[in-house]
Amino acid sequence: MGMSLDPATETDEEIDIFIEDGKIAKRGKKLKCKAERVIDAAGSYVMPGFIDLHVHLRDPGYEEKETIASGVRAAAKGGYTTILAMPNTKPVVDNADVVSYVHKKAESEGLTRVLQVGAVTKGQQGEELADIKGMVQAGSPAISEDGKSVMRTDLYREAMKIAAECKIPVLAHCEDIHLVQGGVVNADEITKKQGLAGITNSVEDVIIARDIILAKETGARLHLCHCSTKDSVTMVKQAKADGLPVTAEVCPHHFTLSTEDMVPYDTNYKMNPPLRTKADVEALRQGLKEDIMDVIATDHAPHTKQDKNQSMQKAPFGIVGIETVAALTYSELVLKGYLTPMQMAEKMSYNPAKVIGSDRGSLEVGKDADIVIFNPKKTYQIDKNNFASKGRNTPFDGRTVTGEVEYTICGGKMIYEKEMTGEKA
């Protein structure tokens, strides 16, 4: 028996859950059922399996950074039962064939469920729309040009119209490329003293404003990826007040670290959007607390050691995060009073499911048995050398955190348990 947190029904109670044929068959106190295995979750939280709307699996084309196999192992270890893979691979996921390739390869692993997001434009070149309807028919739950924004507003508006017709969300990477001007970190006094070119908040905010306007015009469901600025929270709040179909996600690095935490010239602190100021961090935390910001996602972006072992100007943007997100969320948001444990479950499972129109993210009877068991008392240091991901590019190596995923169950199948790794819970 563990503390069940079900955001779908807003119930938190100590109950037993009985799984049969991959489904949640029964739930209640002191169930008497014949089971092949019993897991004692006393003292732990039992939550719906996490859903990550923002993962870079790098496959096809960049398998030296991550493979589908290593990516789903990392996801399972992080408590994820469903992840959305971004389309900026090689080739770009701009047609049904590549969507099917990823889905079949992920299914063969038998671990975390992978849903492949389709690109907005062919080759992500921003000039011609991809086969959006074909990709949706092949199983894409959403479209995104992640890694960049579609700068041709007329083309993007047309894509949003198609997305609305197909009843899928647009996952928006908001970055005005004309305002970046070679920036590699946030534009503030700290980074200026280091002689690094800065990325202003306006780079993100301008495109957020544009995309909200287009959502209003087209009726498309807009989901804003990796929001990092205080004004992003303000704009999302206003969009919701106006009744627009707008949701937003925040990543752990953006609600945990500011530019004051950066180790100078350490490329593991280089991501896009960049780390912002303390004021931005606090605004994001308050936005999550007040349920303005809906989702916690990772933007898991593995790179090789060689990739990152370059100057700040040359090294690629991105950090890994799928194995550290639960602990960081619990340590930085729950223990510090910004979120309740129920809100954590909501933002990591139920709300992401709603964004993509899925009925997952629930522990109700009859639902797929997608479950994560999370120990809220375990304190330890993050060790990048223990990652299942091929990527080791994290700014959190050595950081002391509280909270650990002990078991991940996907469709009734145990896909991760801590004891499998040889570690003691």
Feature names for model-found ranges:
Residues 53-66, 87-89, 115-128, 195-202:
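Active-site mouth loops of central-metabolism enzymes
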Residues 193-221, 268, 289-296, 301-376:
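His/Asp/Glu-enriched, well-ordered alpha-helical/loop segment
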